[in-house]
């Protein structure tokens, strides 16, 4: 509910913003002749000033107006720099609207969005679930490959979030990341597998959509979650229901046997009834085995049936296609009424529904016949709907209802919509061919239409009559004569061509009319359409072969006209006919068979439904609508002959609960101990477990929550009750962890220790009944109290030690390490004496954390001599400029990178006043230029220094290098390795800092190279050549460490190269500046891999 309420509040905010935007637009009054064109510019400047204001109310008003502009489709991209500054605002309402804006424009303004990536990372830990989800949406909207590792880690973290709304957005981000980098597929499948186990209805639809996009072939991931998805289906949001139903349809076709076998078996039995072979009887007996539907198959059909009443047309259509594809034929009929109900929706929904009904009506006429009148055409229907309804009526036509339908069609022919009228005539022709009883009636009705005033109706009637006459040509000579008279009045090319073809095919039956028609056509040959010209040529050839005396000269005249026609098809057909019907010395053997070729009996055309071949596409899909396979279409598989093992869908609920709530699956040891508690404590425990189960879907990583992360997360939540509950859970988890690691004691000792630990935990907060029960099995009350006190101290010390070890372990696994921004925090433990060993250890840790004096900037290990071209002498008209990075601290500022530029005069004249101007720097970047050079002698050279603050990014610094006469546009783009300063530190400090920079602050990759490339000298030379880093002494021969800090922010950059077995090594980079770390990793990997 919380996720839904946040979603609705976000939509409500958008609506309010739209209203405010409209009010703001209406108040802008144009001033002067150009007010209409300057109002937008003035309004945007006003918004920028409001966003830079110190008042939150002004910023909030500005953001509402901006979001309103976006809602109305206006371009607000130029406000991106001003909006992104407020991404770290403390006002939650402003922050929400800023994230709404960033999701829209992050992909367009990638460079500016990358500058705020650290803010997005911090927002992933925000106490507000909407902010965490919005930060993930923005992060996944930045379509830059270098942040793929960051997105991957953020998705993993969000998939274990306590909020189902955040987990839902994690599922959405999976699809975006997969489209950006398909190589992450295996890691994303792990997250999908985890989210599929989620019990929240808010997450189910989104994760199934991610499953369909990333790994639709991994059916094994669905087995254990099949029944859960079926049971959750009714409560999932509407669009999630659509996705899940389509996926389960495909799943059912692979896991269950066909429910249609029973009907097929009956048909076979009817055939075998008349056969007397003994072998055939044995086969018949085998087929008589009754079909038993799988319970899981029945579960799916039963749970989707209520969704036929859904208000969402897509859900109803999804259920309908599911019933059509996987349910027994006797049960499909229940979808008819729901589909007919959808015909009251808008025209777009009607179009899709009618297309699917048209496909169904071909195979199951009886299912839709009771609703025949629902498909009658209305005058208000658009043409596309009318034609689809005609198609359905044609498919449903039979001897019983054809008279009613023909009266309906007679009305449709008179429609003002000519396209619809023509389609109706085609429908009448199809009815005439499929129902022999009304063939003559339809033909006579079509002949009457030949005298219609509308030329399109007459032309379509001619085409349909031509097809009907092909079936019974000998009986309709009078109709052909009547159609020949229409040649003078019909101008539609298709109709004229059809009449000529009919006369040509029946030229022997109308021997007096055919030559005269050819004479008329020869007069107008040059003005006819190409389709008509082809039929004139065919008519001439047929008459030449049957009535050569009357038509020989006329045919030769037509052939001469066709020989010089502009269309090459006409010329080609003319040459072909001439060689075939006019024999000469070069004529081949085919001339003898010309009459058989031209006057052969043609088969009658088949008037079929255009939806006949669409049944192999899944109903309701884009491929079915287009009648062609669309990109991303997943085909339905054939039913398996033998059902796969159904036990793969069995889920052992008890074992899952034990694994989810205990550190090492010790449920069997916990249950006996619980029996010693009083009834009141059992009630409290059950209430705690029930309250915790509400967030069970979010705590997929149970061990991390039990080892302390849940207490840190919950400390940021506004609910104090939730915080206390999670702390108590973490305390119990810590005690169980300490108990689990004390392996030196025997089984009975460990059980006694467990009882006393539980007693010491509950003695302060609950009644003394439980302690008295435990004391009855031991000695006196005083002895038990002293023993419990000493044991509690001992266990507390062991627990403190184990907690610190567990924290070091979880830092390697955790995705979002909160220690990056906070000092080392003490774990949550039971009350202990003031000077406990754990406190002393924590104080020592705090003292060690202030080690800034130990880490200091060092001199560079290596300075490459490689120079970069700043200005070529040809482009600079004789002035050439090169630059390189001396890897020294900049004298112009601590945050600037030092750059030395060498200027050369390659001309034979003096170049004067060399200076820099026209700086075009990205936001936040600064430049300290060199002093102007008065003159540079011919063939002279000079080296100058300058400093640029690149803001820890590899963005290009653009400026103009000018002389007295010219200005040249130049750029400096720093390699990522030159944005660092080498640092000297000990191995101990390196490991400590590295331990604090884990999770999202760590990127790694595997390197494969020849063994000779992994020697210490080669690795050192390659690393320091790419990056300005210092060498950290290492006590291990297979690990090489390098350290540096970024010039602008001073963030540590720790590089580790760890040699593995064989010819592989692991490259690890730890830094808060994750973008720079990813770029450095990408540059170091090919260098270390190559020989």
Curated annotation (Swiss-Prot):
Signal sequence interval, chain numbering: none
Comp. bias regions, Acidic residues: 679-695, 703-718, 776-789
Topology of this chain in the membrane: Peripheral membrane protein
Start-end of Low complexity biased regions: 763-775
Biological processes annotated in GO: anterograde axonal transport; anterograde synaptic vesicle transport; intracellular protein transport; vesicle-mediated transport
TM stretches of this protein: none
Upper taxonomic lineage: Eukaryota, Metazoa, Chordata, Craniata, Vertebrata
Subunit structure: Adaptor protein complex 3 (AP-3) is a heterotetramer composed of two large adaptins (delta-type subunit AP3D1 and beta-type subunit AP3B1 or AP3B2), a medium adaptin (mu-type subunit AP3M1 or AP3M2) and a small adaptin (sigma-type subunit APS1 or AP3S2). AP-3 associates with the BLOC-1 complex. Interacts with KIF3A; interaction is direct; interaction is impaired by pyrophosphorylation of AP3B1.
PTM comment, free text: Phosphorylated on serine residues.
Disulfide linkage: none
Sequence ranges of Basic and acidic residues compositional bias: 267-288, 667-678, 719-736, 790-807
Protein's UniProt name: AP-3 complex subunit beta-1
């Amino acid at each position: 509910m919380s996720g839904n309420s946040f979603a609705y509040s976000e939509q409500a905010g958008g609506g309010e913003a739209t209203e405010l935007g409209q009010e703001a637009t209406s108040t802008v009054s144009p001033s002067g002749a150009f007010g209409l064109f300057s109002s937008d510019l003035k309004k945007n400047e006003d918004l920028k000033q409001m966003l830079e204001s110190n008042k939150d109310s002004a910023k909030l008003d500005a953001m509402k107006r901006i979001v309103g502009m976006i809602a109305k489709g206006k371009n607000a991209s130029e406000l991106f720099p001003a909006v992104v500054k407020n991404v770290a605002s403390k006002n939650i309402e402003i922050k929400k609207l800023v994230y709404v804006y960033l999701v829209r424009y992050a992909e367009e303004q990638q460079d500016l969005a990358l500058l705020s990536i650290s803010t997005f990372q911090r927002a992933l830990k925000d106490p507000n679930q909407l902010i965490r989800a919005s930060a993930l949406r923005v992060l996944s909207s930045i379509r830059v490959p270098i942040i793929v590792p960051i997105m991957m880690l953020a998705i993993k973290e969000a998939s274990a979030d306590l909020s189902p709304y955040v987990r839902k957005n994690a599922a959405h981000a999976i699809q975006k990341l997969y489209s950006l980098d398909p190589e992450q597929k295996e890691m994303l499948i792990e997250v999908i597998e985890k989210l599929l186990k989620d019990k929240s209805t808010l997450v189910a639809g989104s994760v199934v959509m991610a499953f369909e996009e990333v790994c639709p072939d991994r059916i094994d991931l669905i087995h254990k979650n099949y029944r859960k998805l079926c049971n959750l289906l009714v409560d999932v949001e509407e669009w999630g229901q659509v996705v899940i139903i389509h996926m389960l349809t495909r799943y059912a076709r692979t896991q269950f046997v066909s429910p249609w076998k029973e009907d097929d078996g009956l048909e076979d039995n009817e055939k075998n009834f008349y056969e007397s072979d003994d072998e055939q009887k044995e086969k018949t007996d085998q087929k008589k085995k009754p079909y038993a539907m799988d319970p899981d198959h029945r579960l799916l059909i039963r749970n989707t049936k209520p969704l036929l009443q859904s208000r969402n047309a897509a859900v109803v259509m999804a259920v309908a296609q599911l019933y059509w594809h996987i349910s027994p034929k006797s049960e499909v009929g229940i979808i008819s009424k729901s589909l007919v109900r959808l015909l009251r929706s808008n025209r777009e929904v009607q179009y899709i529904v009618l297309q699917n009904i048209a496909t169904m009506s071909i195979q199951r006429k009886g299912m839709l016949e009771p609703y025949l009148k629902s498909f009658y055409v209305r005058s208000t229907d658009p043409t596309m709907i009318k034609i689809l309804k005609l198609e359905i009526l044609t498919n449903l036509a039979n001897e019983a209802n054809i008279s009613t339908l023909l009266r309906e069609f007679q009305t449709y022919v008179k429609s003002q919509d000519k396209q619809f009228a023509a389609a109706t005539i085609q429908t009448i022709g199809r009815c005439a061919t499929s129902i022999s009883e009304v063939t003559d009636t339809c033909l006579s009705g079509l002949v009457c239409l030949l005298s219609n005033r509308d030329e399109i109706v007459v032309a379509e009637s001619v085409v349909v009559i031509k097809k009907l006459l092909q079936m019974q040509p000998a009986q309709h000579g009078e109709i052909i004569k009547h159609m020949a008279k229409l040649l003078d009045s019909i101008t539609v090319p298709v109709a004229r061509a059809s009449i000529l073809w009919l006369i040509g095919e029946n030229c022997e039956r109308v021997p007096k009319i055919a030559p005269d028609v050819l004479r008329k056509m020869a007069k107008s040959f040059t003005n006819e359409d190409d389709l008509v010209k082809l039929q004139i040529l065919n008519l001439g050839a047929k008459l030449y072969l049957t009535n050569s005396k009357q038509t020989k000269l006329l045919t030769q005249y037509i052939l001469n006209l066709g020989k010089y026609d502009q269309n090459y098809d006409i010329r080609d057909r003319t040459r072909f006919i001439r060689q075939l019907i006019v024999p000469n010395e070069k004529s081949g053997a085919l001339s003898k068979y010309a009459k058989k070729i031209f006057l052969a009996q043609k088969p009658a055309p088949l008037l079929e439904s255009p939806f006949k071949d669409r049944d192999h596409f899944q109903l309701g899909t884009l491929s079915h609508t287009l009648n062609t396979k669309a990109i991303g279409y997943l085909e339905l598989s054939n039913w398996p002959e033998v059902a796969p093992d159904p036990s793969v869908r069995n889920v052992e609920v008890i074992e899952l609960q034990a694994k989810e709530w205990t550190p090492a699956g010790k449920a069997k040891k916990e249950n006996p101990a619980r029996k010693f508690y009083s009834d009141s404590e059992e009630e409290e425990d059950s209430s705690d477990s029930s309250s915790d189960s509400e967030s069970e879907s979010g705590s997929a990583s149970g061990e991390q929550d039990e080892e302390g992360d849940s207490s840190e997360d919950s400390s940021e939540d506004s609910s104090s009750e939730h915080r206390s509950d999670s702390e108590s859970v973490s305390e119990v988890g810590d005690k169980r962890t300490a108990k689990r690691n004390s392996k030196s004691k025997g089984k009975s000792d460990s059980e006694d220790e467990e009882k006393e630990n539980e007693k010491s935990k509950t003695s302060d907060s609950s009644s003394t009944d439980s302690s008295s029960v435990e004391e009855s099995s031991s000695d006196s009350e005083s002895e038990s109290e002293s023993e419990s006190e000493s044991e509690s101290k001992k266990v507390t010390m062991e627990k403190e030690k184990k907690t610190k070890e567990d924290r070091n372990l979880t830092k390697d696994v955790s995705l979002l390490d909160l220690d990056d921004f906070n000092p080392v925090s003490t774990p949550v433990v039971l009350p202990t004496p003031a000077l406990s060993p754990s406190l002393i250890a924590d104080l020592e840790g705090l003292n060690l954390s202030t080690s800034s004096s130990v880490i200091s900037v060092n001199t560079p290990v290596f300075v490459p001599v490689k120079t970069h071209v700043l200005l070529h002498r040809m482009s600079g008209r004789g002035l050439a400029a090169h630059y390189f990075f001396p890897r020294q601290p900049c004298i112009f500022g601590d945050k600037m990178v030092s750059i030395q530029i060498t200027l050369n005069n390659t001309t034979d004249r003096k170049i004067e006043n060399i200076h820099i101007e026209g700086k075009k720097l990205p936001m936040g970047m600064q430049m300290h230029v060199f002093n102007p050079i008065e003159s540079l002698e011919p063939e002279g050279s000079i080296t100058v220094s300058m400093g640029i603050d690149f803001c820890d990014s590899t963005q290009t610094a653009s400026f103009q290098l000018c002389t007295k006469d010219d200005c040249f546009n130049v750029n400096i783009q720093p390699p990522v390795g030159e944005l660092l300063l080498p640092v000297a530190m000990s191995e101990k400090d390196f490991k400590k800092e590295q331990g604090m920079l884990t999770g999202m602050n760590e990127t790694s990759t595997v390197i494969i190279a020849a063994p000779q490339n992994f020697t210490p000298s080669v690795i050192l030379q390659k690393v320091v050549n790419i990056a300005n880093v210092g060498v950290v002494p290492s006590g291990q021969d297979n690990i090489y460490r390098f350290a540096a800090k970024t010039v602008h922010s001073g963030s540590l950059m720790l590089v580790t190269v760890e040699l593995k077995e064989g010819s592989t090594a692991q490259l690890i980079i730890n830094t808060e500046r994750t973008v720079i770390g990813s770029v450095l990793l990408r540059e170091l990997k090919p260098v270390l891999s190559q020989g």
